[in-house]
Amino acid sequence: MGKVLVLYHSASGNTATMAQLVGEGAAAIPATEVRLREVDVATPDDVYWCDGLAVGSPTNMGVLSWKMKRFWDETMFNHWGKVDGKVACAFSSSGGWGGGAEIACQSLQMVLMNFGFLVFGVTDYAGKITTCHYGAIAAREPRDAEVKEACRLLGRRLAEWVAVVADGRREQHPLAKPESRTLPG
């Protein structure tokens, strides 16, 4: 069974809403166990437990929040090199469109790569003009149907990769399920 951890910091509740949606998406893949943890209560054992990790943070001046950075700098510092090879992705909520959420996702991915996580983007579209190539993003609370679907899509794709990488379930590979994909054009 694949294990997915959705680790998040939410200053206003918006990123927490995204975390719930990412978790819903991951749970849609059979044989996937999902846990949500707020960064203030998360421990290294939570990170060890998972096969795949979705990390969410509010956008703070274009990058990840200080609480999320502190978790990796302090809580996970002595665990460097011990979580190599787990699959991971990112999501972020900003104060508005153009508020830096994609850059915040990239800053989260940089942290994850430094710890040895295998990060990915999603080529599928969550709607006519909504993607999550760098992670799922929202301007404030995810209200829009396409933004909500992007969060779920990110979670589903994470659980698919966990199924393939950790459980060897090749039938869950995105290319093995063309009917479930939404590509541009």
Where are the predicted features?
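Helix-loop-strand module that forms the ligand-binding subsite of alpha/beta enzymes
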Residues: 40-127
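Residue-level preference for long, well-ordered alpha-helices that form the structural scaffold
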Residues: 11, 64, 101, 140-147
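Glycine-rich phosphate/pyrophosphate-binding loop and the adjoining helix
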Residues: 121-185
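Short helix-capping segments at alpha-helix termini
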Residues: 25-32, 78-82
